[in-house]
């Protein structure tokens, strides 16, 4: 089987991808048997190509799965941990913009009663 391109895989359905993955795994096992029994050099060099193709298929499957999950959870209140932004622990616990701008009743009253003084400079 020739080297598979990821862009060709992205258009396929999940069932097709799983079937292709199964075919690649069967081919890999046959190549490994050929390696043990002393197969041709062309078969031995093909093992690497097939392994990388399997990795490509799995990568495309996982990426599309994650993309679909992102679409599903978009706008929902709770998301799985792996779909939330990573950031650092401290950044995740930090107050958000709205919480930072909140003021207590006492602070609001003080600002209303004692506004900032405006001075005019005499030229």
Curated annotation (Swiss-Prot):
Gene3D superfamilies the UniProt entry points to: 1.10.287.310, 6.10.250.3450
Modified residues (Phosphoserine): 29
Database matches in InterPro entries: Ribosomal_uL29, Ribosomal_uL29_CS, Ribosomal_uL29_euk, Ribosomal_uL29_sf
Disordered as annotated region, ranges: 95-114
Keywords: Acetylation, Cytoplasm, Isopeptide bond, Phosphoprotein, Ribonucleoprotein, Ribosomal protein, Ubl conjugation
Covalent link location (Glycyl lysine isopeptide (Lys-Gly) (interchain with G-Cter in SUMO2)): 25
Protein location: Cytoplasm
Source taxon at top rank: Eukaryota
SUPFAM superfamilies linked to this entry: Ribosomal protein L29 (L29p)
One GO term (biological process): maturation of LSU-rRNA from tricistronic rRNA transcript (SSU-rRNA, 5.8S rRNA, LSU-rRNA)
Record-linked Pfam families: Ribosomal_L29
Modified residues (N6-acetyllysine): 19, 43
Cellular component terms (Gene Ontology): cytosolic large ribosomal subunit
Protein name: Large ribosomal subunit protein uL29
UniProt gene name: RPL35
């Amino acid at each position: 089987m020739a080297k598979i391109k990821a862009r060709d895989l992205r258009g396929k359905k999940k069932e097709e991808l799983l079937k292709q993955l199964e075919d690649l795994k069967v081919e890999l096992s046959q190549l490994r048997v050929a390696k043990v029994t002393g197969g041709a050099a062309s078969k031995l060099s093909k093992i690497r190509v097939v392994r990388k193709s399997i990795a490509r298929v799995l990568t495309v499957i996982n990426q599309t799965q994650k993309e679909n999950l992102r679409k599903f959870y978009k706008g929902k209140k709770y998301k799985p941990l792996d779909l939330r932004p990573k950031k650092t622990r401290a950044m995740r616990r930090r107050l958000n913009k709205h919480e930072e701008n909140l003021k207590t009743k006492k602070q609001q009253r003080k600002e209303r009663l004692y506004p900032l003084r405006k001075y005019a400079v005499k030229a």
